[in-house]
Amino acid sequence: MTKVIDFVVTWVDGNDEKWRLKKAKYDGSINTSKYSMNSEKAYREWGTFKYWFRGVEKFAPWVNKVYLVTDNQKPDWLNIDSDKLVLIDHKEIINNDFLPVFSANPIESNIHRIPGLSEHFVFFNDDMYLTAKVEPTDFFSEEGLPKYNTALSPIIPERYGTGNFQINDMEIVNSHFTRNEILKNGKFFDPKQGLKNVVKSLLYKNSKFICGFWESHLPYPLLKSTMELVWEKEKDILERTSASRFRNPSDTNVWLFKYWQIASGQYAIGNPKLGGLFTLDNAGPDFWSLLNSGKYQIMCINDGFNIQNEELVMNNFINALNSLLPEKSSFEL
């Protein structure tokens, strides 16, 4: 594959006093408690972001550009003169009438507006770490289609989870594609999806409606043209999400564009063993060993709601990352 591939990552420093004061002007009526949709946990900065960049440089040196999207912030250690780094402020991609925003949904729904972004790009959250070597073909096929591992799967509506967003995403997808079109295009029963996913799809294939897609919580290969197409067809809905200053149950999210690729059949099947989703809630010696084992090429490591000793876990997490990625990258001063 000879396509140019960029990476896009979003980041916020919730410890930044200037940013906190700006947020405080708007969040008076918002529930920001631990288990809420807009929990302060979502903005925590643990000092691990430099390891995200180290992973990119060590395990994906082929990447063209890395676009870091922030709210006029940057880590103190960041080398802004790095040849591959491009800093993007929210005002460059989001309508100024909607700013400031403190939710990932409007930000991620507008990443296709990044100036200079390539047609083929991979979107990362800042907790999605490269932990072993990856190739362009892990994300895109030789024909340039994004690679996903998926299945038919019901959406679980959790009070403070992403279920509301997924339901809204699927409502849009189901309004543009019939059930039969999705079943035909989705490649759900291909053995390359993995046995668990094929079995799951078989269980739900006779549902009256397409109930949802299984979400891997790994980086999202996307096509800029697909995001532009969905925006063209659903501008009003996506503008409402873009104007959503805090997470709102009526929002869509970035998975909409991935779901569109799946429903239209414009995707290739990815490796079901490429990576996994983990939480630090019960992290111990076995997990730190796993992080350094090379078993997974990508690990999404969520900080969780129920960490018992946050300071200890944070120190162990940083030590484990430093063991895997001890060398400073060109993205660092």
Curated annotation (Swiss-Prot):
Ribosomal protein as UniProt keyword: no
Any one biological process term the GO annotation gives: polysaccharide biosynthetic process
Entry GO MF terms: transferase activity, transferring phosphorus-containing groups
EC number: 2.7.-.-
Segments crossing the lipid bilayer: none
Domain of life: Bacteria
Other notes: Stealth proteins are part of a protein family that is conserved from bacteria to higher eukaryotes. Family members were first identified in microbes as proteins that help pathogens to elude the host innate immune system. Microbial stealth proteins are involved in the biosynthesis of exopolysaccharides. Stealth proteins are predicted to function as hexose-1-phosphoryltransferases.
Name of the protein in its database record: Capsular polysaccharide phosphotransferase eps10H
